[in-house]
């Protein structure tokens, strides 16, 4: 092998390695975003259920459901002043 061939193999290997690292980073960010979206959907679904129950005429709130949603929001790291205690 000539030095030029060896240098080309090293450069191609380095570029492939960088490509794998980059795609791994992108995949990790995508999965984190997907998990965040799932948590948001769960919270919104609980809030929707609470509102539906509240719209019923016989709804008596002891604050337990609202506190459960607030704890869920805070435990998932959402930073929304509406949910601050």
UniProtKB/Swiss-Prot annotation:
Places the protein is found: Host membrane
Membrane-protein topology: Single-pass type I membrane protein
Transmembrane portions of the chain: 8-28
Cytoplasmic compartment residues: 29-85
Key words of the record: AIDS, Apoptosis, Host membrane, Host-virus interaction, Inhibition of host innate immune response by virus, Inhibition of host tetherin by virus, Ion channel, Ion transport, Membrane, Phosphoprotein, Transmembrane, Transmembrane helix, Transport, Viral immunoevasion
Gene Ontology cellular-component annotations: host cell membrane; membrane
Chief subcellular location: host cell
Xref: Pfam families: Vpu
Post-translational modification: Phosphorylated by host CK2. This phosphorylation is necessary for interaction with human BTRC and degradation of CD4.
Activity regulation description: Ion channel activity is inhibited by hexamethylene amiloride in vitro.
Keyword Membrane listed: yes
Single Gene Ontology BP annotation: viral release from host cell
Keyword Ubl conjugation attributed: no
Extracellular side: 1-7
GO MF annotation: an example: CD4 receptor binding
Domain of life of the source: Viruses
Subunit structure: Homopentamer. Interacts with host CD4 and BRTC; these interactions induce proteasomal degradation of CD4. Interacts with host BST2; this interaction leads to the degradation of host BST2. Interacts with host FBXW11. Interacts with host AP1M1; this interaction plays a role in the mistrafficking and subsequent degradation of host BST2. Interacts with host RANBP2; this interaction allows Vpu to down-regulate host BLM sumoylation.
Job description of the protein: Enhances virion budding by targeting host CD4 and Tetherin/BST2 to proteasome degradation. Degradation of CD4 prevents any unwanted premature interactions between viral Env and its host receptor CD4 in the endoplasmic reticulum. Degradation of antiretroviral protein Tetherin/BST2 is important for virion budding, as BST2 tethers new viral particles to the host cell membrane. Mechanistically, Vpu bridges either CD4 or BST2 to BTRC, a substrate recognition subunit of the Skp1/Cullin/F-box protein E3 ubiquitin ligase, induces their ubiquitination and subsequent proteasomal degradation.
Similarity comment text for this entry: Belongs to the HIV-1 VPU protein family.
Domain notes for this protein: The N-terminus and transmembrane domains are required for self-oligomerization and proper virion budding, whereas the cytoplasmic domain is required for CD4 degradation. The cytoplasmic domain is composed of 2 amphipathic alpha helix that form a U-shape.
Note: HIV-1 lineages are divided in three main groups, M (for Major), O (for Outlier), and N (for New, or Non-M, Non-O). The vast majority of strains found worldwide belong to the group M. Group O seems to be endemic to and largely confined to Cameroon and neighboring countries in West Central Africa, where these viruses represent a small minority of HIV-1 strains. The group N is represented by a limited number of isolates from Cameroonian persons. The group M is further subdivided in 9 clades or subtypes (A to D, F to H, J and K).
Name of the protein: Protein Vpu
Annotated organism of origin: Human immunodeficiency virus type 1 group O (isolate ANT70)
């Amino acid at each position: 092998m000539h030095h030029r061939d060896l240098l080309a193999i090293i450069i191609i290997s380095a570029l492939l390695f960088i490509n794998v690292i980059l795609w791994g980073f992108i995949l990790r960010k995508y999965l984190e975003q997907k998990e965040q979206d799932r948590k948001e959907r769960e919270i919104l679904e609980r809030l929707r259920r609470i509102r539906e129950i509240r719209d019923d005429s016989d709804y008596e709130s002891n604050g337990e459901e609202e506190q459960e949603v607030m704890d869920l929001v805070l435990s998932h790291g959402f930073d929304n002043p509406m949910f601050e205690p």
